[in-house]
Amino acid sequence: MEQQLKTDGLNLSIRDAVKEDRISELPEDLLLQILSDIPTENVIATSVLSKRWRSLWKMVPNLTFDFTFDPKYHQTFSENLYRSLTSHEASVLESLQLNFTRGIDGLNIGMWIATAYVRHVRKLVLVSFGDVRDKRARFRSALFNFNDTLDILEIQDYILLDLPSPVCLKSLRELRLYEVHFKDEASVCNLLCGCPSLEVLSVHRERNVDVETFTIVVPSLQRLTIYDFCIGGGKGGYVINAPSLKYLNIVGFEGLDFCLIENAPELVEAEISDVSHIANENILESLTSVKRLSLESPIKIKFPTGKVFDQLVYLDVLTKEREWWNLLSRMLESSPKLQILKLTGLSCIEKGLDGQNWNPPKCVPECLLFHLEKFLWTGYEWQRGDEKEVATYILENARLLKKATFSTKRIDLENLEKRREMLNELASVARASDSCHLVFHSI
């Protein structure tokens, strides 16, 4: 007699129940995509489901192993990881992520990475978890040698790179370093010089005291992001030599000794945030070739004397700092081809600044007379006299302005009428451009 299953009061035969296994009927590519989002140890367990699933896990292109728990599972973790890598049958291993703690020794990690290289891994992510009391996992040059398929390398947290000789990652295109320590300045150099195809570099540092001079010399580099949050206690600094660099993002430099951009003639776009109190820097001076520029801390870095931003068409200035408008004036005077001006306000603007007067440029800047077409002000503080002065000046002098947009923060009902009056005053300003469309809205 055929065994019966009872579901919701209905009799259903095992044969019919098996037919309801619709997931096994999905295309293999879709199944592999689904399995790629599941921890690899769980993926391996699917091999017992049916004959079709027996070998399917071996084709999964993205593998993630997490050893951040009890060290007593070390042996099982190692066996599963090694089994997965040696049994992998896809032509290319798209990605391998290893999350580990101090319970994993460097020899095992080296063996796993070497096996991944044999499987032509394209993306490798190494994450070491711990706290300030833990000894960092030490990686040496041999771990990153003789690979010609790796495209992306990401190294995170409690890892020390001790690289006495150059690495050899010929095809590496993107490198991400998050709170990684280096043994010395030579280790930084030996990592970067061993990546001749590197185009994208992200460096995140916090409370790092590993190297004083972080030198970035990469001829092929096109995009660079540096986050450094050594607030008030930073020593040393950065030297950047990247002749092919097109995009630069610097965040959090405060109290460093220097930041020198020695060679970056191809820069197109730059974003500078929270940069202040650097004894020796040439940041703005090195950005005169950019077409798009965002500045968050305008008054705390040197303005280049006699320099002209003659390629700049887009400028974004944050209005939170004291007398931010002084830098705005200088940027308008130095950017003859500027087409789009954006001012961004924050709720953390310093109190007690109202009543200070803005001194506009002595002569109307060339960009206002001949090029500026769009003016955006996000977080416009309608109650502040200095901001009204700046807005009025732009409207009265930008002859080709097509659209001016002012976004104000939401306010209490009791202040709605006062805000309406202030915005109506701004709307009544005699605009230099007859075709300028004025827009107000809340954010």
Curated annotation (Swiss-Prot):
Pfam families: F-box (PF00646), FBD (PF08387), LRR_At5g56370 (PF24758). Residues 357-408 form the FBD domain. Disulfide bonds: none annotated. SUPFAM superfamilies: F-box domain, L domain-like. Coiled coil: none annotated. LRR repeats lie at residues 74-100, 152-179, 180-205, 218-252, 272-297, 320-345. InterPro entries: F-box-like_dom_sf (IPR036047), F-box_AtFBL13-like (IPR053781), F-box_dom (IPR001810), FBD (IPR006566), FBL13/AtMIF1-like (IPR050232), LRR_dom_sf (IPR032675), LRR_FXL15/At3g58940/PEG3-like (IPR055411). Keywords: Leucine-rich repeat, Repeat. Residues 20-68 form the F-box domain. SMART domains: FBD (SM00579), FBOX (SM00256). PANTHER family: EMB|CAB62440.1-RELATED, F-BOX/RNI SUPERFAMILY PROTEIN-RELATED. This is Putative F-box/FBD/LRR-repeat protein At3g49030. It comes from Arabidopsis thaliana (Mouse-ear cress). The lineage of its organism: Eukaryota, Viridiplantae, Streptophyta, Embryophyta, Tracheophyta.
